[in-house]
Amino acid sequence: MEKRMSKTELTRHEIREKALQALFPLDFNADLTKQDAIDYALAYDNREIVSEDGEDLVPTYLDLLVGGVCSRKAELDEVITNHLGNNWSMQRLAKIDIVILRLAIFEMLYVSDVPNIVALNEAVELSKKYSDDRSRKFVNGVLSNVMKEIDSEA
C-alpha cells in the first residue's frame, strides 16, 4: 500500500512546528542548507505543499521563520542569555528549548501580526510536545519576561 502525500495548506501552528523541525538540525549540521532543512521538515509527515499549477511550494511564513531565526541567531541568543536566571547559561539549556525560545522571540520582535502572547503560547505548546514539563515551565518563564520587557518598551 503506497503512502500518499496530502496536499494541504498548513496552519500557522503547523508552520511553527515545521520551522522547529527545520531549525533544530541546522544547529548540528553545518553542511545542511536552510532549504534542505525546510524540505526535510515538510517531508517528515509526508505532506506536500503545492501551488495551483502543481509546483512544490514552501509556505512564505515557514521561510520567514527559518530564515529570520537563522539570520538573527546571535541576537536572539543574546536576548535569551539576558533573560536567564543567575545560575543559568545557554550551555545548560536543552538544544530543543533553545530553538523553541529563538523561534518565539523572533516572532515577538519581528512579526508584527502575531501578538506576543500568541508567540509565547505557541512556544509552550511546542515545548509540551518536544520537551518535558520542566522545560515547558522554563520556556514559559523566560518568554514571559521577554514579553514584559518588549511590552514595557512599546
Curated annotation (Swiss-Prot):
UniProt-listed InterPro entries: NusB-like_sf, NusB_fam, NusB_RsmB_TIM44
Gene3D superfamilies for the chain: NusB-like (1.10.940.10)
Keyword Transcription attached: yes
Domain of life: Bacteria
Keywords linked to the UniProt accession: RNA-binding, Transcription, Transcription antitermination, Transcription regulation
Gene Ontology cellular component terms for the protein in this record: cytosol
GO biological process, one term: DNA-templated transcription termination
Record SUPFAM superfamilies: NusB-like (SSF48013)
GO molecular-function terms, A-Z: RNA binding
UniProt cross-references to PANTHER family, sorted A to Z: ANTITERMINATION NUSB DOMAIN-CONTAINING PROTEIN, N UTILIZATION SUBSTANCE PROTEIN B-RELATED
Described function: Involved in transcription antitermination. Required for transcription of ribosomal RNA (rRNA) genes. Binds specifically to the boxA antiterminator sequence of the ribosomal RNA (rrn) operons.
Family: Belongs to the NusB family.
UniProt-recorded name of the protein: Transcription antitermination protein NusB
Gene that this sequence comes from: nusB
